[in-house]
Swiss-Prot record:
Mapped zinc finger ranges (C2H2-type): 101-125, 141-163, 169-191, 197-219, 225-247, 253-275, 281-303, 309-331, 337-358
Family, per entry: Belongs to the krueppel C2H2-type zinc-finger protein family.
Source organism per UniProt: Homo sapiens (Human)
Gene3D superfamilies: 6.10.140.140, Classic Zinc Finger (3.30.160.60)
GO cellular component, one term: nucleus
Pfam families per record: KRAB, zf-C2H2, zf-C2H2_6
Family matches, as SUPFAM superfamilies: beta-beta-alpha zinc fingers, KRAB domain (Kruppel-associated box)
Major localization listed first in the record, in broad terms: nucleus
Record region (Disordered): 73-101
Function: May be involved in transcriptional regulation.
Subcellular location(s) of the protein: Nucleus
GO-annotated biological processes: regulation of transcription by RNA polymerase II
Name used for this protein in its record: Zinc finger protein 844
């Protein structure tokens, strides 16, 4: 039958753990160890109660050197006196087994059973000084990186593994790594629940009392280890040692592949995964693998939506501790980030924005414009702005153009919009364009297309209700004008105007013609109706005709073809709703001086493609056109209410239409 060794049943404490025990626990420990020694037949060393506290006051001593070892019968030393007699034990009142050899220390005179016990005791007496105990044939194990000496080779091997980052044993449940097999065995007891000491708070089982006491600090928040330099407290002695290296700058753990040094072995071990590409932590739900355990823990909370870190002041919960630390700064009012260039203290988010001011970093650049463009544009509500929008596209500009554009609500702006397209401008152009509600602006819109302009043009246009303006509308088409023309065109309600209607087509006019035409009920005007066809007239013609019921007059109407003087035309349209495409409110090709057009867009909801309300190309003098459209809802394509091609002087035509409801196509 094999004898039981003391290593199999002994429980060891570190210096920090022994200091945490109260006197009753220390007395209990002494009694248990004494009873254990009495029951072991292979132990013959003297037991002294007073040496227990001395052992834990001296961290270099091993408890087993005070309690004894198994008898080493195979080795002999010259300084040991061999004896076959039984060694009396005053404390245990027992005799050792026959044939036990005793060894006496030459330093202090104590007698030990076995050479290994004596050798450990000599190291304790000489305090790890190799010059004093080399005579006994013992070579100390020194670490070349930290210059630390070890008593036995296994401890030295563990230290070497720590420096190289080699950890052979990983816990699959919590991700911790261990150097020795015994360490992971003790650790697995906590997960399996086989330990004798169970935590009152969480129910975890600990294999021994020392681990149980250390585990309790997680719940109690006890931090007995304080840094002498900064006063920071820690729960574990190893954490304090790693923290002290931040003050000294010591980084003993170096990576062999890249040469990077670290202050703790765990940091080195995790760093090695960047070279090997190892990702040991895999999510069971989605299969995603992670290199670090804390990243794996944060990822698992995305599936469970668990927020384990809660703010003590406001109760807000977070998924990871880094978010909680940033949140706690908002309560304390501290600004941890300080700018090294200007010394300004900022929060984490504002610090990143602040550093761009010093570095002059501009990550957002326009691909089409080389020079910077300054536009004071105020957007109150912009929700769905998308790609490639150029609110002002200026290709060749000599002087800057300042365009204040306040947009109250802009929800649906889309791609490639150019409200103002200026190709070649010599002087700045000032265009106040207030848009209250713009919801449906779409692609390729050019509200003002100016190709060649000598001086600035101020164009205020008032449109109260424009809901259905469509493509290519030209209510007034003036090709060549020598003097300005004044056309007050009030449109009350425009409902049914359709394509290609020319109520008055004046080609060549010498003198004015006054034609008051009253159409009370015109519902069904049809095609090719020419009530008055005058080809060549030199003097004015006064025609007062009352048409009470004209229902089927249609398009291609030319009441006046050729005249030499002005024609004054006032066209009030009460009900005009369906004006359609090809409308140009003012088409002037060549302009030398200013053109003033006041614009007010109150409700523009469905503006569509290729609209040019003002196309000014060639004109010699100013054209002042005031267009008041009260309700224009359904304007349609290619309408030219006034088609004046060659005019020498002003044309004034007064034609009141009371009810025009059913004008139709061609």
């Amino acid at each position: 039958m094999d004898l039981v060794a003391f290593e199999d049943v002994a429980v060891n404490f570190t210096q920090e753990e022994w200091s945490l025990l109260d006197p009753s626990q220390k007395n209990l420990y002494r009694e248990v160890m004494q009873e254990t020694l009495r029951n072991l037949a292979s132990i013959g060393e003297k037991w002294k109660d007073q040496n227990i506290e001395d052992q834990y006051k001296n961290p270099r001593n091993n408890l087993r050197s005070l309690l004894g070892e198994r008898v080493d019968e195979n080795t002999e030393e010259n300084h040991c006196g061999e004896t076959s007699s039984q060694i009396p034990d005053d404390t245990l009142n027992k005799k050792t087994s026959p044939g036990v050899k005793s060894c006496e220390s030459s330093v202090c005179g104590e007698v030990f059973v076995g050479h290994s016990s004596l050798n450990r005791h000599i190291r304790a007496d000489t305090a790890h000084k190799p010059s004093e105990y080399q005579e006994y044939g013992q070579e100390p194990y020194k670490c070349q990186q930290r210059k630390k000496a070890f008593r036995c080779h296994p401890s030295f091997q563990m230290q070497e593994k720590a420096h190289t980052g080699e950890k052979l044993y990983d816990c699959k449940e919590c991700g911790k790594t261990f150097i020795s097999h015994s360490s992971i065995q003790r650790h697995m007891i906590m997960h399996n629940g086989d330990g004798t000491y169970k935590c009152k708070f969480c129910g975890k089982a600990c294999p021994c009392l020392s681990i149980y006491l250390i585990h309790e600090r997680v719940h109690t928040g006890e931090k007995p280890y304080k840094c002498k330099q900064c006063g920071k407290a820690f729960s574990y002695s190893t954490s304090l040692q790693i923290h002290e290296r931040t003050h000294t700058g010591e980084k003993p753990y170096e990576c062999k592949e890249c040469g990077k040094a670290f202050g703790s072995p765990n940091s080195l071990y995790e760093h090695r995964r960047t070279h090997t590409g190892e990702k040991p932590y895999e999510c069971k739900q989605c299969g995603k693998a992670f290199r670090w355990f804390h990243s794996f823990q944060i990822h698992e909370r995305t599936h469970s939506e668990e927020k384990a870190y809660e703010c003590t002041k406001c109760g807000k919960a977070f998924k990871c501790p880094s978010y909680l630390c940033r949140h706690e700064v908002t309560h304390s009012g501290k600004k941890p980030c300080e700018c090294k260039q200007c010394g300004k203290a900022l929060s984490y988010l504002n610090f990143q924005r602040h550093m761009k001011m010093h570095t002059r970093m501009r990550p957002y650049k326009c691909k089409t414009v080389e020079k910077p463009l300054i536009l004071p544009v105020r957007f109150e509500d912009m929700k769905e702005l998308t790609l490639e929008r150029n609110l002002m596209n200026a290709s060749t500009v000599v002087k800057p153009s300042i365009v204040p554009v306040p947009f109250t609500i802009m929800k649906g702006l889309t791609l490639e919009r150019n409200p103002m397209n200026v190709s070649s401008v010599v002087k700045p152009s000032f265009l106040p364009l207030p848009f209250d509600i713009m919801k449906g602006l779409t692609l390729e819109r050019n509200r003002m297309s100016v190709s060649n302009v000598g001086k600035p043009s101020d164009l205020p246009h008032t449109f109260k209700c424009m809901e259905g303006l469509t493509l290519k509308r030209n209510p007034m088409n003036v090709s060549s004008v020598v003097k300005p023309s004044f056309f007050p065109l009030p449109f009350d309600i425009m409902k049914g105007l359709t394509l290609e209607r020319n109520p008055m087509s004046v080609s060549n006019v010498g003198k004015p013609s006054h034609l008051p035409h009253t159409f009370k009920c015109m519902k069904g005007l049809t095609l090719e109706s020419n009530c008055m066809n005058l080809n060549n007239v030199k003097k004015p013609l006064d025609l007062s005709e009352t048409f009470k019921f004209m229902k089927r007059h249609t398009l291609e109407r030319n009441p006046i073809r050729n005249m030499e003087k002005h024609s004054t035309i006032s066209l009030p349209f009460k009900y005009m709703q369906q004006c359609t495409e090809d409308r140009m409110p003012m088409n002037v090709k060549s302009v030398t001086k200013h053109s003033y057009l006041p614009r007010s867009f109150e409700y523009m909801q469905e503006h569509t493609l290729e609209r040019n309300p003002m196309n000014v190309r060639n004109a010699e003098k100013r054209s002042i056109i005031f267009l008041l459209c009260v309700y224009t809802k359904g304007c349609t394509l290619e309408r030219n209410h006034i088609n004046v091609r060659i005019v020498g002087k002003h044309s004034v035509c007064l034609v009141p239409f009371v009810d025009i409801k059913g004008l139709t196509l061609e």
